[in-house]
């Protein structure tokens, strides 16, 4: 059996890229927000590994804030996606209001955790 992993990977990358090109701009913006939140969490973890985690509550609050915000944004993306049949009757304004309310609750809990 011939090994064509390079060609297969290139074909997979090309198909993913062409499928993502057809994604609406609103979903791409949400994806960018999720990527930024995860990137910020990774920066905090690297900083903690290099410098230390003396105020551990602050480090934990920052990372949980980033991860929680990313999870809520993924939920928003699922609800706003027009191809998703499960949330077809849910208007995008309602989904965004849910996102804002859940983000508010998340950050209130995180501020309470800080002390």
From Swiss-Prot:
The chain crosses the membrane at residues 32-52, 56-76, 95-115. It is a multi-pass membrane protein. GO terms for biological process: protein N-linked glycosylation. Its main location: endoplasmic reticulum. GO terms for cellular component: oligosaccharyltransferase complex. Coiled coil: none annotated. Residues 53-55 are lumenal. Pfam families: DAD (PF02109). It is found in: Endoplasmic reticulum membrane. The keyword Protein transport does not apply. It comes from the Eukaryota. Residues 1-31, 77-94 are cytoplasmic. Belongs to the DAD/OST2 family. Subunit of the oligosaccharyl transferase (OST) complex that catalyzes the initial transfer of a defined glycan (Glc(3)Man(9)GlcNAc(2) in eukaryotes) from the lipid carrier dolichol-pyrophosphate to an asparagine residue within an Asn-X-Ser/Thr consensus motif in nascent polypeptide chains, the first step in protein N-glycosylation. N-glycosylation occurs cotranslationally and the complex associates with the Sec61 complex at the channel-forming translocon complex that mediates protein translocation across the endoplasmic reticulum (ER). All subunits are required for a maximal enzyme activity. This is Dolichyl-diphosphooligosaccharide--protein glycosyltransferase subunit DAD1. The gene is DAD1.
């Amino acid at each position: 059996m011939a090994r064509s992993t390079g060609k297969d990977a290139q074909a997979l990358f090309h198909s993913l890229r062409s499928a993502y090109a057809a994604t609406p701009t609103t979903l791409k913006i949400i994806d960018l927000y999720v990527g930024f939140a995860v990137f910020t969490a990774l920066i905090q973890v690297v900083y903690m590994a290099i410098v230390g985690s003396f105020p551990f509550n602050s480090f934990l609050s920052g990372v949980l804030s980033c991860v929680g915000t990313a999870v809520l944004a993924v939920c928003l993306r699922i609800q706003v996606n027009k191809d998703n049949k499960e949330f077809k009757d849910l208007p995008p304004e309602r989904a965004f209001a849910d996102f804002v309310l859940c983000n508010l609750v998340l950050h209130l809990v995180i501020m309470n955790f800080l002390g």
